[in-house]
Amino acid sequence: MKILAKNKRAYFDYDIEQTYDAGLVLSWHEVKACKMDHCTITEWIIRYDEKQRSLLLINMDIPLYSKTQQSLVPGYIPKHPRQLLLNQREITRLVASTKKTGLTIVPLELFEASNRRIKVKIWLAKLRKKIEKKDRKSVV
């Protein structure tokens, strides 16, 4: 498992409840750009799309792969929403827990799995209060 991008701030801002590994729907040039470490994870947001009944990864900035010709991908938008691949049962569990208990879905890291697929590790997490962050800082 090779980690391609990591959200270090999430460790400080959130308490973990559960973790999930989700696949991503990417095109071939986006996969190559991710494997070349050309994407950042700090601004990512995960939202639920009620029309498609799926989770979307928003603000994932993947620039065009350097060796790709512009004519092969006309009108490419680097920050378009990308769909997360999870079971419907997992999606309903995540959405229900965010609505019921006030937890948030946080993307933690982008990694290449053993089968050479690009995946995202996501947390179901609780936001820490400012006082809890200070206590955590003094302990560490």
Language-model-detected regions and their locations in the chain:
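Ribosome large-subunit tunnel/peptidyl-transferase-proximal elements
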Residues: K2-L103
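RNA pseudouridine synthases
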Residues: I3, L24, I122-W123, E132
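Alpha-helix boundary/interfacial micro-motifs
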Residues: I45-I46, Q70, V106, I118-K119, ...
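Beta-rich strand-turn-strand
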Residues: L85-K129
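Conserved small/polar residues in nucleotide/adenosyl-binding loops
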Residues: V139-V140
